[in-house]
C-alpha cells in the first residue's frame, strides 16, 4: 500500500513537472510548499510514533521560521528604514 502511494505521488509530481516544462513555467514557491505539505502528510500517516513526534516538531519549527521570514522580518526592516 505504502509503495503504491509513493509511486502515485512520484507519478503526479512527474506529470506536474512535464506540464510546467511544456508551458515554459517553473515551480513557484507556493507550488513547492504545497508539495512539501502533501509529502509531509503522507509521511506522517505511514510513520511510527517516535518519528511522528520528530516530524511534527520539525514542521512546526519550519512553519515558524517561514512566517517569521515572510511577515515579521519585513516589518522590522520597514521600521529600520523609517527611522
Curated annotation (Swiss-Prot):
Its keywords, alphabetically, are: Cell membrane, Membrane, Transmembrane, Transmembrane helix
InterPro entries assigned: DUF5510
Annotated S-S bridges: none
Topology of the protein relative to the lipid bilayer: Multi-pass membrane protein
Q: What is this protein called?
A: Uncharacterized protein RP098
Q: Which GO terms describe its cellular component?
A: plasma membrane
Question: Where in or outside the cell?
Answer: Cell membrane
Membrane spanning residue stretches: 5-22, 32-49, 56-78
Amino acid at each position: 500500500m505504502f509503495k503504491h502511494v509513493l509511486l502515485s505521488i512520484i507519478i503526479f509530481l512527474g506529470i506536474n513537472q512535464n506540464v510546467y516544462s511544456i508551458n515554459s513555467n517553473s515551480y513557484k514557491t507556493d507550488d513547492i510548499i504545497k508539495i512539501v505539505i502533501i509529502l509531509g502528510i503522507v509521511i506522517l500517516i505511514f510513520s511510527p510514533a517516535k518519528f511522528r513526534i520528530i516530524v511534527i516538531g520539525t514542521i512546526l519549527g519550519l512553519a515558524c521560521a517561514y512566517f517569521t521570514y515572510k511577515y515579521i522580518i519585513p516589518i522590522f526592516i520597514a521600521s529600520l528604514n523609517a527611522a
